[in-house]
């Protein structure tokens, strides 16, 4: 492929990402797996300034689950990851947390930034980013095939605490043909800024998952004969910390509903 053709492909991908954000700003709600292929996606959590240092330390101590791509200063809502984007409106669905409890989901978080003008926002790498390379390698991504949300599970693995924050690891799951698991691990492992290689392969009970067909977040997916469940660290882990730690106030993305950036996935390939 010539440089000119590569530039055209990148331009089309950026245009797709911007179109997606514009549609979410206009009120469209959908999981973002498979949206703007080739572009990086990010989880989001915004907390009052008083909790920002605790979370930054929590992310630093748990980089597999919480790889920070950008930190937006208190009260601001623009990011270097997407020119012209507004973090308050350009995610398809937000969750609102008060005292560690989920109180509502909203499509427009603007009033929450007005209510809490000191919110510090963290954008965290998402495994949706390496799904395009998986597909390009001929590895099926079941939730994209089925047009559903990725299944996510709370586990029995505790994250390293930091300050007032503690909680368990959350994982996403993709069923992978046994013959392709090594390939999936190698491909995803080249993207450490978006969770990297799997944290567990096989027996879900070893993670404390009693029923793999009943995810804590997202949708259940088919696991066919010859496939093995493969688990990756997940950016919903901060939401588990919000619940466990009783954080007074926080805004997050709804699981599976990410911030689609203008940054090519190749940026985070090592």
UniProtKB/Swiss-Prot annotation:
SUPFAM superfamilies: PSTPO5379-like. Its EC number is 4.2.1.-. Signal peptide: none annotated. Pfam families: D-Glu_cyclase. The keyword Lyase applies. GO terms for molecular function: lyase activity. InterPro entries: D-Glu_cyclase, Putative_hydro-lyase, UPF0317. Belongs to the D-glutamate cyclase family. This is Putative hydro-lyase Reut_A2449.
């Amino acid at each position: 492929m010539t440089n000119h053709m590569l530039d055209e492909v990148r331009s089309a991908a950026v245009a797709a990402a911007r179109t997606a954000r514009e549609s979410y700003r206009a009120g469209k709600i959908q999981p973002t797996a498979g949206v703007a292929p080739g572009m990086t996606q990010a989880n989001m959590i915004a907390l009052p300034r008083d909790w920002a240092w605790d979370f930054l330390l929590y992310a630093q101590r748990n980089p597999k689950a919480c790889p920070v791509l950008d930190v937006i200063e208190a009260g601001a809502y623009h990011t270097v990851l997407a020119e012209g984007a507004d973090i308050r409106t350009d995610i398809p669905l937000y969750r609102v947390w008060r005292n560690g409890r989920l109180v509502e989901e909203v499509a427009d978080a603007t009033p929450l930034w007005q209510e809490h003008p000191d919110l510090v926002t963290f954008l965290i790498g998402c495994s949706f980013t390496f799904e395009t390379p998986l597909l390009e390698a001929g590895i099926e991504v079941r939730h994209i095939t089925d047009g559903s949300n990725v299944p996510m599970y709370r586990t029995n693995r505790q994250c390293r605490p930091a300050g007032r924050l503690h909680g368990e690891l959350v994982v996403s799951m993709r069923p992978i043909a046994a013959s392709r698991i090594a390939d999936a691990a190698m491909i995803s492992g080249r993207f450490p800024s978006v969770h990297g290689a799997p944290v567990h392969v096989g027996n879900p009970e070893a993670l404390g998952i009693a029923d793999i067909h009943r995810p804590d977040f997202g949708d259940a997916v088919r696991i066919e004969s010859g496939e093995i469940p493969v688990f990756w660290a997940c950016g919903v882990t901060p939401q588990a910390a919000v619940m466990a730690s009783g954080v007074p106030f926080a805004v997050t993305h709804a699981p599976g509903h990410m911030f689609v950036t203008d940054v090519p996935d190749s940026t985070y390939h090592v």
